[in-house]
A protein has these predicted regions:
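Walker B beta-strand of ABC/ABC-like P-loop ATPase nucleotide-binding domains
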Residues: 65-66
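A general structural motif
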Residues: 60-62, 89
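Walker B catalytic acidic pair
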Residues: 69
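Inter-Walker segment of RecA-like/P-loop motor cores
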Residues: 14-59
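Single conserved hydrophobic/aromatic residue that forms the stacking wall/gate
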Residues: 1-8, 12, 174-175
Length: 176
């Protein structure tokens, strides 16, 4: 995830940062960037009501909301964030992935793709050796290094996943 820079922090005086409960257990309620920056974040779960929380906090003039790992939002929570954006004119930035290891959309991602005013794709490169294509697929591996095709949609741990272009994802499935 991209952490707001100090320049953005100056513009957005009162930021509310959110991270999902499933990720917070690993990261101690902080949002971590790949370059080592970290910021404290409020933790949400599937029952969290963004409207109640933000409307109470807006007495302190919230100027920006950032949601990390937004694929873990429910579709109702995405609608709540849209309402906050529309009614309070608060910019909301959501960061997350589109699909799971089976190539299926997360419910939060589906809702965001349907309702977002603007979508910016942050590109990454396929992890297959010597490939330079854009990564669009996520593969999950078990402890023995074997690719997994079944199981819970959520299994936290970056060491269990690799990103591939569609071609190399498909080829990795053939070897099973």
């Amino acid at each position: 995830p991209r952490i707001l820079s100090s320049a953005a922090s100056d513009v957005y005086k009162r930021q509310l940062l959110f991270t999902p409960e499933v990720d917070a257990k690993i990261h101690d309620s902080f949002i971590h960037s790949r370059i080592g920056l970290k910021k404290p974040a409020y933790v949400f779960n599937e029952k969290f009501d963004f409207i109640d929380y933000v409307y109470k906090e807006n007495k302190k003039r919230v100027s920006c909301i950032l949601v990390d790992e937004a694929q873990f939002l429910t579709s109702e929570q995405v609608k709540q964030l849209c309402r906050i954006c529309d009614e309070k004119n608060i910019p909301i930035m959501c960061y997350g992935i589109r699909t799971d290891f089976r190539g299926e959309l997360f419910p939060g991602s589906l809702a965001l793709l349907s309702l977002a005013d603007n979508i910016i794709e942050l590109k990454t490169i396929c992890e297959y050796p010597s490939c330079s294509r854009k990564a669009t697929m996520i593969a999950r591996y078990d402890k023995d290094g074997e690719i997994v095709l079944e199981g819970n949609q959520i299994d936290i741990g970056a060491d269990k996943y690799k990103v591939y272009c569609r071609k190399h994802y498909r080829l990795s499935l053939i070897h099973i």
